Amino acid sequence: MKKMIALALAALMIMSVFAGCGSKEAAEEKDYSSMTLEELKPLVKTLNEGKLTMVTSPDFAPYEFYALNENGEPTLSGFDIALGHYIADALGLTLEVIPMDFDGTITELANKKADIGMAGYSPDPAREKVMSFSAVYYTGGQSFVTVNDKASQFTALGDINKADYQIGAQIGSIQAKLAKEHAPDADIVELSKVTDIIAELLSGKLDGAFIETVPAQAYAANYPELNLVLDVPYEAEGSVVGINKDNAALLAAVNLIIGQALEDGSMAQFVADANELAAGDKFEGLLDENGQVAE
């Protein structure tokens, strides 16, 4: 009997410890959302002390790309990059940007090798399994793009779904999901860079492609033969910051900073500046091993 009572008491103690831990964690999680930025800053932990490590895919103007100066020297630019610096500055950190292919950014966040990622992410439920989402900082749209010579073939979304069409989209993107949804019978060609999609469109290898509206408009400004023929409905339009999963303090801080950037007009200025730069000389893709524009 004594053994049974002792075991019962031990079980109750263990349950109370776990319940207490759960309550404490829940309280801490809840507390983050009620804290000010100044209260959060000392609680924010990053992979490298003093740095905010951000992954991005610089092939998506005006979000992220390389602006070229008169000597052809590339500078990482775009409103995602500007927002990244704004967030780092607000946290008292130095921004470290690591360029890579789009799907690589998701892998790095999933493996917790980056603090944040910005690459025109939409809040897709599948991605939420491997990263946390910030509040929406920019709302855009989705478009179906083709060349002028083929524009008359696409007057409605249903026109895209033909077996003899080759339809492009970026690997791992919302646009790839939309392509499969609206053109299941077509040959969906997923490419790692939007620049490759544009090149394939212009060369006639693709009949059309799903591209986010703002970057598509930037490409069309440089290549008049491109035509944004259709708006593509998507229920979760908007861009978010991807954040290292379970870093609740960083998530809460980023949300506060995004709210500040939207309120003080900084975000609108970042978008305006990026669109102006994107209309000039630029390179979209990864630089070579010497940090120069790849041939």
Question: Which functions belong to the PLM regions below?
Answer:
Residues 54, 58-61, 74-89, 121, ...:
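Bilobed "Venus flytrap"/periplasmic-binding protein-like clamshell domains
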Residues 89, 94-159:
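Acidic, polar ligand-binding/catalytic clefts
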Residues 58, 139-146, 213, 217-258, ...:
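Periplasmic-binding protein-like
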Residues 103-104, 121-130, 177-181, 202-203, ...:
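A ligand-binding cleft/hinge motif common to bilobed small-molecule-binding domains
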Residues 26-34, 41-44, 174-191, 228-230, ...:
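Ligand-binding clefts/hinges and TM-proximal coupling segments of bilobed small-molecule sensing domains
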Residues 28-121:
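Extracytoplasmic small-molecule ligand-binding "clamshell" domains
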Residues 79, 96-108, 152, 189-203, ...:
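Short helix-initiation/N-cap motifs at beta->coil->alpha
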Residues 22-24, 28-34, 81-90, 148-150, ...:
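Extended ligand-binding regions for polar small-molecule ligands
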